[in-house]
Amino acid sequence: CVKSIYSYYVPSSTDWSIQDACKGFFPNVFVDIEGACAEKKYKALSCYRTELRDAPHPRSIESIQILDKACGIHVGLKSAECFMLHRRIV
């Protein structure tokens, strides 16, 4: 049984949606990914060569690293993955 439903930020895709209170991405869950976890993320992303572009494109490794640092800043971490919790059953 699914207990929680989250969405995540997709660089250069999420930005094109209409940003209002009913739609849009407003993160409220942050996961610390500093260090080895972040490196695994970037290594995994590099496997998707057709999806990545050169900086300053939002889907470049460099831009994604900057986004991760910006997400971390919001919650006092060096690097974070941000999610939006839509529903949780407790």
Predicted segments with their positions:
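Metal-dependent de-N-acetylase/amidase catalytic core
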Residues: 1-90
